[in-house]
Amino acid sequence: MSNSHPYASFQDVSLEYPNGTIGLSKANLSINEGEFIALVGPSGSGKTTLLNTLAGFVHPTTGSVSINGQVVADESIFVPPEHRHLGMVFQQHALWPHMSVGRNVEYPLKQTKTPQDERRRRVNWALKLVGLEGFADRNPSELSGGQSQRVAIARAIVAQPSMLLLDEALSALDEPLRESLRLELRHMTIDLGLTTLHVTHDRGEAIALADRIVMLDHGHIRQIGTPDDLLNRPADPIVASFFDDATLFEGQCDNGIFRTHKPSFHIPTRLLQTEDGMPEGPGTLVVLPDAMTLVEDSIWRENTAVSPDMDTSSL
């Protein structure tokens, strides 16, 4: 469970690539200490760009990025990745094939000139934490895909970072293994108090793991909220369609009645769930799958408040 202290933040962060493509557009996000945040969205939405901006792999065009109260990137400041004290795991675990498991895991510690005895202790601790105790002398070629990803996770946490970045870290694994690692990963981040930013294309994974979810589309943050918020109170049709395969009806709201264009029906706005009431004018009706039931036409006409024509006298 997270507390209210922001550990990382993005303030009006925009990123434009040299070819003119917009990676991010005025992104604002505060990540609380100990919080597990999932970044979701379609391909090209900006979720990996947001993570890479925090990691220090790209420099934002405008805006600022802060970690633990320190600005690490703005128009004049740029702290390189190796000085941001972040652990990172990617879709491809990228273990060095010529190094043993133990040497792979200890690599970040050698870069910081950690004493050998302390390196050995931390490597054993990290491997035990991911369920690979006794694997230090094995070669990567002897490992399964799941074991290799566990080694990558051990390497990411061995230097005891205060924040963990995951970029599709589980997506290359088979579903039964992914499910198992999801649970272990969540328990581990809670036990270690790690603030976590997790990029995933899997809606179910985001819902299962995250304290809050950030939905992006074309570089814009569409909504930030709990899994329940995005499932049951989507901010717009894009969020609704991504999370729940919602059916969308374009229409017009007039005098307390929402009338759709095609197919044509109308419904009193008092029956609709809205954040701040239903404003007059054009809009989109979002119907979630579990809100629909198929019934016989005669039963529907007798019991529904939704009418298939424009006659409102029965409403």
Regions found by a protein language model. Give the residues of each.
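Glycine/charge-rich catalytic "coupling/switch" loops of P-loop NTPases
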Residues: 262-315
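ABC ATPase nucleotide-binding domains
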Residues: 85-87, 91, 95-238
